[in-house]
């Protein structure tokens, strides 16, 4: 998969969000935005896809301990923190 910056503008998650709103994004694209950037040879979209393949969907991701995310290549502390915060915000909105 090419780097996100090499994709056509209408296929880049951030640009798509700005143009069409967050509801237009797939789960993979939402996660890619949280991940921010990939590693050499692996885009944020690919890392997001790896997470979704491992945990099936966003709901599957939501219940996991932070250290479990480290199984995915390139998912380190800073990326895990962003994902955990997003789920915590969603939980607080939903349950309070």
Report each predicted region and the residues it spans.
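Basic, amphipathic DNA-recognition helix from helix-turn-helix-like DNA-binding domains
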Residues: 85, 89-96
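Long, highly charged, low-complexity intrinsically disordered interaction regions
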Residues: 1-69
């Amino acid at each position: 998969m090419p780097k996100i910056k090499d994709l056509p503008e209408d296929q880049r998650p951030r640009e798509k969000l700005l143009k069409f709103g967050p509801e237009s994004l797939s789960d993979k694209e939402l996660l890619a935005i949280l991940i921010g950037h990939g590693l050499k040879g692996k885009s944020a979209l690919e890392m997001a896809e790896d997470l979704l393949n491992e945990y099936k969907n966003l709901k599957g991701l939501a219940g996991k301990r932070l250290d479990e995310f480290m199984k995915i290549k390139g998912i380190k502390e800073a990326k895990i923190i962003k994902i955990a915060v997003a789920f915590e915000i969603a939980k607080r909105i939903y349950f309070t």
